[in-house]
Amino acid sequence: HDTGIGAIMWGAVIAICSLVKLSEIQFGYSLPFDIYLLTIVAVVPQVFITIKEKKERKVKSFDDAYMDYIWLGFGIGIFLMIFIINSVFSVWGPVAAEYRELTGHASPFSFREFIAPLFLLLYGLPTFITGAACKFKPMLWGGFFCWVCCIITIYTTIKIDLLLTAASAIMAWLIPGILMEREYRIYKKEQASLHV
């Protein structure tokens, strides 16, 4: 039984980061740091949550090991995608500046408009697999919701992309996490009553 705490945390962190970034764009201000750095900070409690949950497990099944590797692969994939995107931005920045200098206006192509679909594609994969493997429909549908939003964000502006990313985090992780946590509490009460 997963406690759901990790899913709640990641759903909240990604939703908050997306909504704060949207607010920065909408209202024309800038925080002194990139709000998405909170995701790096969130790795620390995730490690502690994972260690605590592993200690509470009496037996580690094949399914548990399989899920651990799926989510580890997801984390590595996200890290690599961020690295690739930052590498592309480091090359694209000077090209865009030169274009502006030569033409007198910004390039009609904005690379950041195409980042959200990539993240939503990745968000959906382990979420969908976990939901299907664990027969937990809220997470299965959350993964599917990420993929629908992935397709939509190809055709929308960055502001809509950020709203859909926040909605995806809520649908894929926050709500399923809350439901898992509720089931976990019920399970723990039942286990406690059996050992009385």
Model-derived regions, located:
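Terminal transmembrane helical module of multi-pass membrane proteins
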Residues: 126-196
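Membrane-proximal helix-loop-helix units in multi-pass membrane proteins
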Residues: 70, 74-139
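Membrane-embedded alpha-helical transmembrane segments of multi-pass integral membrane proteins
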Residues: 13-17, 41, 45, 123-126, ...
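Transmembrane helix-loop junctions in multipass membrane proteins, especially transporters and channels
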Residues: 22, 26-30, 54-58, 90-98, ...
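Membrane-interfacial loop-to-transmembrane-helix junctions in polytopic alpha-helical membrane proteins
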Residues: 2, 27-34, 59-66, 104-115, ...
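Residues within membrane-spanning alpha-helices of integral membrane proteins
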Residues: 4-11, 75, 117-120, 124, ...
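Hydrophobic alpha-helical transmembrane segments
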Residues: 10-24, 43-49, 109-120, 160-168, ...
